[in-house]
């Protein structure tokens, strides 16, 4: 090639521009910075950068007793605090060797709350994602109205709409309210219809279809390489779901399907979310029908659980147990465990180490959102800048657990 031809090609090559999106930008769904290299409107290179929301939750847990650490686990995936609570206490229960002694009422209640929280979390992602795709108004209002019904159940049951810290090692913090079943029944009556309406509005919107179909595609091999789990993996043809592959809390006894898509695009990530919510409603229905109302809500073990107040007033032994648990907590045998559950965003795992004391020696969390965020180069490169907003919305990360 002559020098003249080389210069001519150089003049024709579009100029590249570096653009920084975030960390304070509504489209990033949190404090995320994405450094983009653009040729015109096309993303040539994408580099996600996290760490702006670091809260030191794992380190904080090392300075709290085993039960106290439950309260900080809520703050990671703040849209799904029940998942954080449950995964952590299950790890501690495994260290103690009491996982088979957890009362059935506590196990079934955990399942109901986990699935309610899954639906609530998905509704946030769908509502805000609808805004990102230009579907202003209807999706977010419908989604948040239905989510508000779930938060009412949480508030009535746990005392908090968010960050309830309701799980305890051995069971639940306190018993269910007398009208718990009625509140969940009322929700189950309206939820299927509302979710179907939201699905019709979003998935059949021609603008959304044009912007999401075949956009931000990730293959099964790429998803595995980036460590994706949950919906972000299941849209690539995999049926991996912790509830099916490694059942916990009796999930093997519930009749539900794991939705699977194969296109791996943004449209599929939204469509599978609706399918998962319908399956969650089926699980809630079955769990509610089999809830042993008169069973204990927490393990009967004075070394681990506070004695009833009336007992403390009349029994010196109960008073001693109460004092010991409040001021010192309980000791956990030395050892290490890894326990994972299926959160709304995928497999959230807890690696917990005990040195035999009353506090964790180490708590390491495997957050599914972290892996989803760092798959953004695959989802963005080769697509338009405007597709970035939708791609981030459909992987649905929560940065409390990314940076923890």
Curated annotation (Swiss-Prot):
Spell out the subcellular localization from the entry: Cell membrane
The UniProt record lists the EC number as 7.1.1.-
- Identify one Pfam family in the record: Complex1_49kDa
One Gene Ontology cellular component annotation?
Answer: plasma membrane
**Quaternary form?**
NDH-1 is composed of 14 different subunits. Subunits NuoB, C, D, E, F, and G constitute the peripheral sector of the complex.
Which Gene3D superfamilies does the UniProt entry name for this protein?
Cytochrome-c3 Hydrogenase, chain B
Q: What GO molecular-function term can you cite, just one?
A: NAD binding
Query: According to Swiss-Prot or TrEMBL, what is its membrane topology?
Result: Peripheral membrane protein
Return the protein name: NADH-quinone oxidoreductase subunit D 1
* Enzyme class label: translocase
User: Which family is this protein grouped under?
Assistant: Belongs to the complex I 49 kDa subunit family.
Write out the function statement from the record: NDH-1 shuttles electrons from NADH, via FMN and iron-sulfur (Fe-S) centers, to quinones in the respiratory chain. The immediate electron acceptor for the enzyme in this species is believed to be a menaquinone. Couples the redox reaction to proton translocation (for every two electrons transferred, four hydrogen ions are translocated across the cytoplasmic membrane), and thus conserves the redox energy in a proton gradient.
Keywords (alphabetical) are:
Cell membrane, Membrane, NAD, Quinone, Translocase, Transport
**InterPro entries linked:** NADH_Q_OxRdtase_suD, NDH1_su_D/H, NiFe-Hase_large
Where on the tree of life does the source sit, at the highest rank?
A: Bacteria
The record's catalysed reaction(s) read: a quinone + NADH + 5 H(+)(in) = a quinol + NAD(+) + 4 H(+)(out)
Q: Which organism is it from?
A: Symbiobacterium thermophilum (strain DSM 24528 / JCM 14929 / IAM 14863 / T)
């Amino acid at each position: 090639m002559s020098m003249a031809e080389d210069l001519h090609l150089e003049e024709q090559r579009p100029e590249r521009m570096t653009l920084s999106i975030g960390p304070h930008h509504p489209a990033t769904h949190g404090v995320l910075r994405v450094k983009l290299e653009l040729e015109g409107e096309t993303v040539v290179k994408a580099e996600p950068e996290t760490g702006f929301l670091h809260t030191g939750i794992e380190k904080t847990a090392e300075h709290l007793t085993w039960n106290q650490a439950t309260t900080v686990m809520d703050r990671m995936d703040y849209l799904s605090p029940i998942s954080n609570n449950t995964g952590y206490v299950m790890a501690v229960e495994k260290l103690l060797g009491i996982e088979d002694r957890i009362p059935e009422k506590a196990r079934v209640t955990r399942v109901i709350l986990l699935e309610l929280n899954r639906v609530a979390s998905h509704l946030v992602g769908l509502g805000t994602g609808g805004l990102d795709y230009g579907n202003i108004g209807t999706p977010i209002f419908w989604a948040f109205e239905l989510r508000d019904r779930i938060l009412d159940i949480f508030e009535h049951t746990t005392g908090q709409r968010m960050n309830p810290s309701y799980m305890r090692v051995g069971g639940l913090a306190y018993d269910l309210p007398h009208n718990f079943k009625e509140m969940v029944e009322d929700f189950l009556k309206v939820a299927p219809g509302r979710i179907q309406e939201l699905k019709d509005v979003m998935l059949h919107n021609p603008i959304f279809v044009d912007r999401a179909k075949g956009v931000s595609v990730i293959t099964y091999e790429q998803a595995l390489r980036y460590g994706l789990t949950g919906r972000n993996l299941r849209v690539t043809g995999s049926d991996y779901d912790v509830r099916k592959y490694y059942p916990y809390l009796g999930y093997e006894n519930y009749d539900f399907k794991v939705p699977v898509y194969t296109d791996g695009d943004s449209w599929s990530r939204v469509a599978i979310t609706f399918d998962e919510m319908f399956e969650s409603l089926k699980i809630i229905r079955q769990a509610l029908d089999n809830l042993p109302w008169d069973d204990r809500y927490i393990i009967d073990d004075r070394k681990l659980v506070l004695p009833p107040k009336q007992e403390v007033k009349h029994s010196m032994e109960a008073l001693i147990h109460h004092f010991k648990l409040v001021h010192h907590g309980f000791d956990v045998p030395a050892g290490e465990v890894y326990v994972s559950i299926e959160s709304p965003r995928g497999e959230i795992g807890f690696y917990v180490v005990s040195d035999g004391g009353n506090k964790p020696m180490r708590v390491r969390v495997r957050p599914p959102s972290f892996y989803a965020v760092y798959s953004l180069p695959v989802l963005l490169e080769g697509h338009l800048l405007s597709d970035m907003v939708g791609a981030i919305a459909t992987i649905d990360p929560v940065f409390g657990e990314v940076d923890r």
